[in-house]
A protein has these predicted regions:
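Rhodanese-like catalytic fold shared by cysteine-dependent sulfurtransferases
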Residues: 2-8, 18-41, 46-50, 58-90, ...
Length: 136
C-alpha cells in the first residue's frame, strides 16, 4: 500500500513539475519596451511582414525554419552586433527549437533597446506540433 501511495505521489509531482516548465503566454515590461511570450497561432498571425529571427545554429536553420526567418545564431560571438543592424523600433519575432534560447535572446534584444520583442512559446517544436509549415 505504501509503495502504491508513493508511486501515485511521484507521478503527480512529476506531472506538476513538467507542466510548470513550459513558458505560458505572457507580457513582460522592460526598461526599453516589452517582451511578449506568444502562442504559435499569435506568432503566425502577427509576424507576417515583420522581422523573424531564428536564433538556432546555422545547421539547425538549414534543416528547416519558419518561412521568411533570418538566422542569427545566439551562440555567435557577433550575435549582439548582428541584432543591432536591425531597426529597434520595429517588432521582432524570435524563436529557437524549444524556447530556452529564445528567452535569452529576447532579454538581450530588449537590453539592446528593442521595443517590441515577441518570443514564440514552445519554439519550433510547438510550431510544428500545431501543424504549421517550415521551409528549408
Amino acid at each position: 500500500m505504501k509503495l502504491l501511495l508513493k508511486s501515485v505521489i511521484f507521478i503527480f509531482l512529476t506531472i506538476s513539475v513538467i507542466g510548470c516548465l513550459e513558458k505560458k503566454p505572457s507580457k513582460t515590461v522592460t526598461e526599453n519596451g516589452v517582451i511578449n511570450v506568444i502562442t504559435p497561432s499569435d506568432f503566425k498571425t502577427n509576424s507576417v511582414g515583420q522581422v523573424i529571427i531564428d536564433v538556432r545554429t546555422p545547421e539547425e536553420f538549414a534543416n528547416g525554419h519558419i518561412e521568411g526567418a533570418i538566422n542569427i545564431n545566439l551562440f555567435d560571438k557577433n550575435f549582439e552586433s548582428k541584432l543591432l543592424k536591425l531597426d529597434k523600433s520595429k517588432p521582432v519575432f524570435i524563436y529557437c527549437r524549444s524556447g530556452r534560447r529564445t528567452a535569452t535572446a529576447s532579454k538581450k534584444a530588449s537590453k539592446l533597446g528593442f521595443e517590441n520583442v515577441n518570443d514564440l512559446q514552445g519554439g519550433l517544436q510547438k510550431w510544428v506540433k500545431n501543424n504549421y509549415k517550415i521551409t528549408k
